[in-house]
């Protein structure tokens, strides 16, 4: 089945591409060096995993997806390439926020105007139904830039961004496959394979990070899949298994809830404290879980399972309609955050800060390296 072929191609390309990327990054001393106050790793780690993810994704899509099944393919690849190049340059030498946001807005306009993939209907949320063209473009651009940055900001501990990305892409692969949109299902499963291949090296002990070149692209593909799903479910009947999707906005919010809620939360707190919303701190959800003494793996698992439970809730409560379901999801997220805040206030522990050294100081082998060793032995 082509779906399986695309998945395995993406996965294997990443698995075999990352070791030489790590070797080159170590040789050229291209590392992720966090600020002193925010160190949570034992060593400086290469952050070019996005190179393997994006390359495998593009290769699999270009090789296996006919243009007839995905008419937007060239525009999607072009827009994704903008973010990949900007992210890669930022990973290597750093870029000003103005340049990064400029690239993100250019990327969003390509999707909203040239590709004509737009959020067109809010289904009564805030009293808004079908929007005119200009309002639709404006909202779409804001949402794209917001979600792209949300995934960029959630990429703070081992495995988190990639695990959430797997959950997002698998959900949409299933939905598009059921809806008969095979090209979009192929695109989503290509991303799934690339991310799982990357996770072999990103689960603790992480050997590589995806970097901005990976997280920006991940956020971009996730939000494009979301917008396409909204358009599709507005135009035709779609089911999640046997459950008819009648509250599509609620389902999309549930799929993206952890990165979106976390970003809105930290931005709000920073502004309430009279700081720039773009000032880096250690107040993200994953940092808060680490402060309870949880490991990276435990924190990643909790957040990914929580996000998945929101999706299950959204699917189960489709009968509520968009306005009520969106309100319930937001209320649940706020209450959960409040309970976490109370729990942290009682059981907080200091986050252990490990010494950062140049190069791979920790000798444990990642799962991906163990797999490659087994293959070479055979």
What does each model-identified segment do?
Residues 36, 90-101:
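Aspartate-rich (DDxxD/NDxxD/DxxxD) Mg2+/diphosphate-binding motifs
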């Amino acid at each position: 089945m082509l779906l399986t072929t695309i998945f395995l191609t993406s996965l294997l390309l990443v698995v075999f591409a990352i070791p030489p990327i790590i070797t080159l990054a170590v040789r050229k001393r291209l590392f992720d060096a966090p600020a002193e106050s925010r160190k949570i790793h034992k060593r400086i780690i290469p952050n070019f995993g996005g190179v393997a993810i994006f390359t495998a994704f593009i290769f699999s899509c270009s090789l296996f997806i006919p243009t007839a099944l995905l008419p937007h393919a060239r525009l999607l690849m072009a827009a994704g390439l903008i973010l990949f190049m900007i992210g890669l340059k930022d990973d290597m030498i750093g870029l000003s926020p103005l340049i990064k946001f400029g690239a993100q807005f250019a990327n969003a306009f390509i999707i909203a105007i040239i590709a004509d993939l737009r959020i067109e209907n809010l289904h009564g949320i805030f009293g808004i139904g079908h929007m005119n063209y200009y309002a639709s473009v404006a909202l779409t651009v804001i949402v794209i830039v917001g979600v792209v940055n949300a995934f960029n900001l959630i990429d703070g501990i081992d495995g988190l961004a990639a695990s959430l990305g797997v959950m997002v892409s698998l959900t949409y692969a299933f939905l598009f496959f059921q809806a008969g949109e095979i090209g979009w299902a192929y695109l989503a499963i290509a991303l799934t394979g690339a991310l799982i291949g990357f996770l072999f090296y990103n689960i603790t002990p992480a050997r590589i990070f995806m970097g901005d070149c990976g997280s920006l692209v991940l956020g971009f593909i996730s939000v494009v899949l979301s917008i396409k799903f909204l358009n599709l479910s507005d135009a035709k009947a779609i089911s999640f298994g046997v459950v008819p999707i009648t509250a599509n906005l609620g389902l999309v919010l549930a799929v993206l809830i952890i990165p979106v809620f976390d970003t809105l939360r930290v931005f709000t707190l920073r502004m309430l404290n009279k700081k720039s919303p773009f000032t880096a701190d250690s107040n993200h959800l994953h940092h808060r879980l680490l402060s309870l003494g949880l490991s990276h793996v435990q924190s990643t698992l909790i957040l990914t399972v929580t996000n998945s439970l929101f999706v299950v809730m959204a699917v189960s409560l489709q009968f509520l309609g968009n306005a009520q379901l969106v309100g319930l999801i937001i209320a649940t997220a706020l209450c959960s955050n409040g309970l976490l805040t109370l729990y942290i206030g009682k059981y907080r522990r200091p986050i252990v800060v490990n010494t950062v050294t140049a190069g791979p100081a920790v000798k444990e082998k990642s799962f991906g390296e163990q797999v490659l060793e087994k293959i070479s032995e055979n």
